[in-house]
């Protein structure tokens, strides 16, 4: 385990390199959370993990709250931690331990007005659909007066909003048939569903130039299998949704399109 960094000499780069050096894939964030809480405490925060395992640090007292909300988990995969030509490489350096480290150091240096408290959160399980850390915050805390979300947008960019997302699982099972016969295989039915869904997304988005306002599908996985009697295909699909399209409407469309080929589409 890495040792704490001296608060008198801590920079954002120091904190970021230390944080990136601790693997924290979704569901296994505890070592990084504990280390970050120690660093925040050294910088003057009251810091500890909350009930979901989020790293939470607070400065100041008062009825008004500013929350700087980042996430501490990363997608899987190891990227060697190194600095090359002044650029830090490592899993999560950009998404999103960089913004989180910036929040921690900037928050420690900020001069807070009377009656204002500052809370920095490194949420867990943001990179998976559970969103455990964020859901815990919603369920257990009152809404802050202001929230800044730490996600990569370029050092000089401010993002004003994010599209919604829906993760779908398509599944279809059919009796096995001879390969020379006319019956569609499960894999073919899954491919047909993907084509229908992608076509619907494109038609919905006709005339819309900006990606933020379009429906954008992504086929993340497509697998087929057979036990000799039945063939099965499973597809995992993500939909990015604009403000004008509700998740309920998108799910209803996907369910209808899936049923056309005898399959099902459920929220994953």
Residue positions per predicted region:
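Metal-dependent amide/peptide-bond hydrolase catalytic core
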Residues: 28, 48, 166-268
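Active-site metal-coordination/substrate-binding segment of hydrolases
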Residues: 65-122
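Predominant activation on well-ordered alpha-helical scaffold segments within soluble catalytic domains
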Residues: 13, 17, 37, 101-104, ...
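Fold-independent oxyanion-binding glycine-rich loops
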Residues: 51-52, 70-72, 123-124, 150-153, ...
């Amino acid at each position: 385990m890495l040792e704490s960094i001296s608060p008198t000499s801590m920079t954002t780069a120091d904190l970021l390199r230390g944080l990136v050096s601790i693997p924290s894939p979704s569901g296994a964030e505890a070592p990084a959370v504990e280390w970050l809480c120690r660093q925040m405490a050294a910088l003057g925060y009251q810091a500890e993990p909350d009930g979901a395992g989020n790293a939470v640090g607070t400065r100041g007292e008062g009825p008004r709250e500013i929350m700087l909300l980042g996430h501490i988990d990363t997608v899987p995969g190891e990227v060697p931690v190194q600095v090359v030509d002044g650029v830090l490489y490592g899993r999560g350096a950009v998404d999103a331990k960089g913004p989180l480290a910036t929040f921690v150091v900037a928050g420690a240096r900020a001069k807070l007005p009377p009656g204002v408290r500052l809370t920095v959160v490194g949420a867990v399980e943001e990179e998976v659909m559970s969103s455990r850390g964020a859901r815990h915050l919603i369920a257990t805390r009152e809404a802050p007066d202001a929230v800044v979300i730490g996600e990569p947008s370029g050092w000089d960019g401010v993002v004003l909003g994010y599209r919604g997302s829906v993760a779908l699982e398509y599944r279809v099972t059919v009796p096995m048939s001879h390969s020379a016969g006319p019956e569609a295989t499960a894999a073919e039915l899954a491919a047909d569903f993907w084509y229908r869904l992608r076509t619907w997304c494109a038609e919905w988005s006709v005339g819309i130039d900006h990606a933020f306002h379009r429906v954008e599908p992504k086929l993340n996985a497509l697998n087929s299998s057979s036990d000799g009697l039945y063939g099965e295909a499973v597809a995992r699909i993500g939909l990015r949704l604009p403000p004008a399209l509700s998740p309920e409407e998108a799910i209803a469309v996907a369910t209808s399109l899936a049923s056309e080929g005898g399959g099902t589409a459920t929220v994953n």
